[in-house]
């Protein structure tokens, strides 16, 4: 009996020792998941950790919280989150209350809400904005954002400023007509009372945390391909400068979209895909990041 007990104890010890490399080692350590900051040429963010660069793998819409300790992104049509703890970054965990095939996930500055676009009736193709809020035991069920977002068309390209004001794109209403474009929804008294159309022509707006500049996707003759990233600066009077192409260090022969600006405004995260608009569920896409110093006047950094 004693010999059998010793065998059991040895087996348990073996399992414990064997588990140390798996469970004892953190997923990643350090700011930005321990990644070396990029230069002026865009590079894949956290390859092998966040981005799986193999064909037909899809990561998109990477976004950090204001303190840099929470990172949200989409992988194969699901939304994931990883958080920086005293032991390092946790392994990405899927937010189970966020449905499959959601789009444009975006993290609030305090990391207590995740915003996204979703359609509960795919036959109508009416994608509307929702959010899930952090609770004591996980995340809430999706909640609509209020009557200001009631619309017969579809929303896309969601982004969020540090003050919870929303910037997003919406298509033309069902049946045609006006009403599409990039919109701004100011956050007032814990809600978004109205949407204001901006004089900008593009999609997938990505706003800086302090709303001082925006990067969006547009189709223009000077682009390297049909869709490129463009930068516009917000003037002191609230108007926007003419958007300019961000150039070949960022744009490529593929599709660039879904810009997200880091909390310190030093870096831009975006998604590059080899065929997002051709087949959005079977393409290859990765999250990239790039230093913005070359692109921003000193007063905007």
Regions found by a protein language model. Name each.
Residues 10-19:
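Bacterial N-terminal signal peptides
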Residues 24-301:
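Short, conserved micro-motifs composed of acidic
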Residues 1-10:
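Bacterial N-terminal signal peptides that target proteins for export
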């Amino acid at each position: 009996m004693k010999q059998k007990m010793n065998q059991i104890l040895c087996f348990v010890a073996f399992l414990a020792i064997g588990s140390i490399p798996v469970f004892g080692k953190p997923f990643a350590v350090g700011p930005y998941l321990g990644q070396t900051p990029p230069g002026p040429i865009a590079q894949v963010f956290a390859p092998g950790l966040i981005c799986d660069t193999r064909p037909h793998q899809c990561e998109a819409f990477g976004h950090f919280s204001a303190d840099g300790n929470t990172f949200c992104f989409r992988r194969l049509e699901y939304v994931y989150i990883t958080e920086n703890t005293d032991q390092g970054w946790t392994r990405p965990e899927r937010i189970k209350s966020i449905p499959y095939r959601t789009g444009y996930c975006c993290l609030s500055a305090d990391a207590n809400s995740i915003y996204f676009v979703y359609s509960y009736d795919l036959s109508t193709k009416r994608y509307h904005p929702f959010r899930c809020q952090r609770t004591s035991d996980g995340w809430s069920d999706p909640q609509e954002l209020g009557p200001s977002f009631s619309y017969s068309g579809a929303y896309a390209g969601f982004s969020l400023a540090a003050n919870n004001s929303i910037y997003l794109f919406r298509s033309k209403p069902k049946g045609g007509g006006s009403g599409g474009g990039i919109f701004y929804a100011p956050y007032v008294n814990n809600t978004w009372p109205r949407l204001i159309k901006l004089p900008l022509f593009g999609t997938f707006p990505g706003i800086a945390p302090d709303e001082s500049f925006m990067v969006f996707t547009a189709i223009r003759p000077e682009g390297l391909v049909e869709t490129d990233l463009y930068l516009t600066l917000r003037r002191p009077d609230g108007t926007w400068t003419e958007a300019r192409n961000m150039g070949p260090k960022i744009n490529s022969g593929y599709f660039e979209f879904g810009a997200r600006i880091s909390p310190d405004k030093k870096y831009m995260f975006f998604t590059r895909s080899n065929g997002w608009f051709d087949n959005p569920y079977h393409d290859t896409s990765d999250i990239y990041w790039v230093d913005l110093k070359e692109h921003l006047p000193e007063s905007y950094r």
